[in-house]
């Protein structure tokens, strides 16, 4: 009998992979058995992730799907879109629990992959089996899930901000705008012109402003909750932080509501959720990703401008945690029957 | 006969005051004759503004309204709201040209001061005489203007983003949201809990999210252009930059429009405007305040998400320049019959 | 029999206090029983430390020394210099273990308090009893210590960089310069002109450059190791980070030494030290505080310029962790007979 | 007769090239006639430098040395080391004034190129003709100079900090350490792993710490001033700013000197220098690059720790201005008989 679940991290040299390692290295019920990287195979993991010096002594290996089941019981795929889908069927056949952090299994409707991702999905049947790994919405389904499609970060921020609103149907259902501000780690570990420090620092730069892909999964999830077709436009902006994403979800109230009523609807919706914190205070009245850095929390709050019936809900996350690796481990924990917060009792840094 | 117009800067120790000095010290047609500061009277200006070491040898003085006309022909008031209004009438009587950078003369309707600023305006007649100092909208009125009410920075960003849209009536007129992201210099030179570096850096922090005051002047100006009542909600967010403000003005198109048509409407609206640059490109497709830092430019651009008829117009400014001191000098230049860009041929820094 | 040691944090609203709480809230063998703040007494701790929302439900209280022994077994004093010394004698009499994070008990020679801190030390006998809380140098003395004087951050960085060098006597003993670069959190939570975000961000600002106080404790500790009088000049510089301190300790080799020999001397000196990591690599060849953020690690490395016999040793710490709260808990753990890393198995964030 | 000197900028797409354009576009006596870029030939300059939108309408071209004399009277070479040297002889033959911003003509001793730059210099005779373009040291030689070797940024900062010290021989001549802190723009416009925003922001990262190349030119210039062999070790550190370099030059006084005497020696050395500002004040007592951003100023100051005879001189520059493009234009102005500050009356931004 094994003491610990052996986990593999595929794509371990990127930021999401690195964040998975940061979490899993102190997870009480897992043992990191394999860390793959095509680019750095054979090199020490801590060479690429100097934060892990002295904590992980493994080297990166090439990903060998044939031997993976000898070494791992569960596998996290931190790979680009369009790559994971080639591995998932076999990994499932081998009996591994698969947590995929790409978009490859997030959408239920295969047609949407053509529209938003420019490819024909080769395994549409797996889309039905995959569970969208947002535990606040899919807790029960995640139990014993074998294929978890971990949400995108801007989608997570947007969905968490809007879910209580669409569930309670207090706003115009066709006019949701999620204006998202994100740190630079969201773009991954690969350098580019736009991520070059002198270009990226001090930028307040809209990007993918004409139709951000995460709208597809956000609409899927919000429509499910609303039991209606929800349209949402996500407009992301690169700002100077490294970690953090704030969604400012602007909507229009259809009826007058007191603030306390809105507060109650949101609080009720998220009652008992381990990683949701509802913000309402006088010193720090709104969510700010600064206060969740390093943790799996999502802070949710709102503001109303009554004279024109504008409601904005805010959600603040650490894009690498609740927006990626943290949420993946949270969903994994549920699927394995662990405590939801195993490995995730990480307290946000302050100041950071 | 004087060679140069003598100008006084009242409230010269703050950031807006300092930025006026940075501009005026190389302005070809002005001479800085008086710089006041209650707090630093008697001390060298360059003690507080070390960037001006070797460039300005004046000391700060106390503001003495009785003697000001001996020393200055024009005066810039960089004072808090509710202070300038006490000085303006006398300064006008003394024959000075007054450029007020506070909100005290921006609104035409005195009732709005009660609602938005919590005071009864003591000189409602002056509100009629004051010219709202946004030269792109009020060029003709600014000629020979004696009292210029220089716009707020978030208002400037919002108005410049939305003016061509409301002028051409292509969107829903009741649902404008200007989601603004601003640098820390917008809060002024006085330290506070929220501006403390460890608190402010990496923040993505909504503030005044339930009714930002600049909405009042933005609605006034946009309604004038639209010849209709325009409602706009301004939701500002503090981000990590020092300088820069980006307004992302989200609206809903009422008719299908090709991008080129939208581009033409915006370009036509701003044709010939010295400090407006229309952005449409493949490497940097949208405005970013990063590319106007240190200059008086406002970069304007847009994005359309056709499937849901969402139009976002962006405007990017340096909040201390086009959002404050630069715009004030631009309006002053017009009022004095100078070239619109005297003292303002400042090229944006890159990278910055 | 108590399950957990009850700990009080006095001065809990500052950054060091907050960092102690971040650590102690997940410490397996302690229970936070009292958190004091003169300024915020009666208010929820999470109001001031929003990162701790949902994690700590205590309110701040006023510090009442008379009742403290009913509530706490150990006490952390996160107070300004000159304040702790008034409380320590009574707290010791009451039987509490005292961990003082101020400078009040760091120096053995009471004369030095007059020179460096401008006060006459009222309890010179306690200076003998206090243990300087740098576990890498005082591990044995810390066992059962009742009064721990936790080191200053710039002193910690300087001592850790130079200890192996002075121990092995390979350099000129009179010419040590520790050029330190530090983040803004080192200045504490109280806003000031210099910490105002627009002033502090992008600063590369020398401060206390004519005799930094931490030299006193660094010289005390380094002289003890060297068994000789060591002089060291600490020249700190404020840079843009929030967390992190790097000491670049410049020295002059008295004999030619191969790099491998220097490496061995440093590695030998720190053999078996839980929180020291010796850095020597090709991608990240020198220590950088970036890779220890959020953790108690100190990364140590060096560079030699042979042609002129210059040796620089570098040490990188998180100033709030190994430079303050983390080191305090580390020393506390040793004094209590706990594992040295209880509560400190915190993995550095990356990227951060 | 030409009204303006026609200038070409070769390598116009990088940061130094861009900064030259920012300066030259408002220079009263030059006309930018050619801007070359191998990578972007045919594309608008403002596509790569969005700050220059509306200010420069030229496209980049390929560099054609044969036709350059038809189009330009002077040429700025903003090219990598080892490239300029191939063009310079022909350009000089063609009668152009050549300002080279690489290291290719900075060193007088050709042997040093083998040691520090790993190449044999093909035109050692030109090294004699080239003038090291630091106007504070070579003003007279720069008049009518045809080949100007513009200094490196870390060398400029180091030389300016140490020149008055070595000239007056008040310190140990063998033990100079210039601990330099620099912003990210110093690394140029090309992205790399180390310049990736999530890696570079918040870094306090030593680099080239075992023998920085700029020591060669610094030692050449300082030895010339001292009329003695000066050794200096330059240890650069990457910090979070975009622009700015601070050299903290640590030295050991050989005699006791009052601060006022040191101040006088420095002030005397730099008397009448247009771009040098000597810093001595109570609010901002030391130089900080923050206060020269965007300008050609170098701020010089110092600190003494008398008890151990340590003297640190500081120099603060904008690495793209006084450290590169600004200084190049300053030297060019002198060579052409223009005012030293033509095009350089740029006031530092504050805050920035």
UniProtKB/Swiss-Prot annotation, chains A, B, C, D:
Keywords for the protein's UniProt record, in alphabetical order: Amino-acid biosynthesis, Arginine biosynthesis, Cytoplasm, Lysine biosynthesis, NADP, Oxidoreductase
UniProt subcellular location: Cytoplasm
Top-level lineage group: Archaea
Catalytic reaction annotation: [amino-group carrier protein]-C-terminal-N-(1-carboxy-5-oxopentan-1-yl)-L-glutamine + phosphate + NADP(+) = [amino-group carrier protein]-C-terminal-N-(1-carboxy-5-phosphooxy-5-oxopentan-1-yl)-L-glutamine + NADPH + H(+); [amino-group carrier protein]-C-terminal-gamma-(L-glutamyl-5-semialdehyde)-L-glutamate + phosphate + NADP(+) = [amino-group carrier protein]-C-terminal-gamma-(5-phospho-L-glutamyl)-L-glutamate + NADPH + H(+)
Root EC class: oxidoreductase
Keyword RNA-binding attributed: no
Protein's GO biological process: arginine biosynthetic process via ornithine; L-arginine biosynthetic process; lysine biosynthetic process via aminoadipic acid
Primary location recorded for the protein, binned into one broad class: cytoplasm
Transmembrane segments: none
Binding annotation for NADP(+): 13-16, 319
A cellular-component GO term for this protein: cytoplasm
Pathway in which this enzyme or protein is active: Amino-acid biosynthesis; L-lysine biosynthesis via AAA pathway; L-lysine from L-alpha-aminoadipate (Thermus route): step 3/5; Amino-acid biosynthesis; L-arginine biosynthesis
The protein's Enzyme Commission number: 1.2.1.103, 1.2.1.106
Function recorded in the entry: Involved in both the arginine and lysine biosynthetic pathways.
Matches recorded under PANTHER family: [LYSW]-L-2-AMINOADIPATE_[LYSW]-L-GLUTAMATE PHOSPHATE REDUCTASE-RELATED, N-ACETYL-GAMMA-GLUTAMYL-PHOSPHATE REDUCTASE, CHLOROPLASTIC-RELATED-RELATED
Protein name listed in UniProt: [LysW]-L-2-aminoadipate/[LysW]-L-glutamate phosphate reductase
Organismal lineage: Archaea, Thermoproteota, Thermoprotei, Sulfolobales, Sulfolobaceae
Gene that this sequence comes from: lysY
